Regions:
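Accessory interaction regions appended to the cores of large information-processing enzymes
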Residues: 1-185
């Protein structure tokens, strides 16, 4: 979002038939991919705004349930003239699957929720950090969540676990970046 690239110069073929987008677009694409990967990219995830209505004695269970799912309470207040307590929270969509069922179980069916899309938020962690070791059948720690999401998505699509910058640079440019210690992944 909000990225702008300016092409300052290009040497095109002399023959008019050989000139065109096919000469510039692949080179520009490789340069932009490499720029994004060397700029420590981050993943974004959708976040729901959740409104939960329940009796006041169920609020502690709601807080516990939201805390286990990376949710955060934005506001809570009783509804005037009723025994109902209203809690507004932000909950990542990734952690919202099964939330309503868990909410009903935790409150013996006394609470119900309404979820709507609210915003995009940065997923914690660096998706390109190779130092993070992911173990099968174990939840990733919060600092490794972005890495886990990227690796699982790449595996599902049949791609290698890691992105290699070498495919976006020519050998001389790659050697120059390595000498500058850019941290090639």
């Amino acid at each position: 979002r909000g990225v702008k690239a300016r092409l300052l110069g290009a040497e095109l073929a002399a023959a008019p038939a050989a000139r065109g987008g096919g000469q510039v677009i692949p080179a520009a694409r490789r340069a932009l991919y490499a720029a994004v990967l060397t700029a420590t990219p981050r993943l974004l995830e959708p976040v729901y705004s959740v409104e939960i209505s329940s009796p006041a004695d169920c609020v502690a269970s709601i807080y516990t349930l939201l805390g286990r799912r990376r949710g955060s309470v934005l506001a809570d207040a009783p509804r005037p003239g009723t025994p109902v307590f209203r809690v507004r929270a932000a909950l990542p969509v990734l952690d919202s699957f099964g939330f309503e069922t868990d909410l009903r179980v935790a409150t013996q069916g006394q609470a119900f929720c309404l979820s709507t899309f609210d915003a995009w938020a940065v997923v914690p962690g660096d998706p390109l950090d190779r130092a993070i070791v992911l173990r099968p059948l174990e939840p990733a720690p919060p600092a490794a969540l972005a890495r886990e999401l990227m690796v699982k998505t790449r595996r599902r699509k049949g791609m290698a676990d890691d992105v290699s910058l070498a495919s976006f640079f020519d050998d001389p440019a790659l050697a120059e970046l390595a000498a500058a210690d850019v941290g090639l992944r």
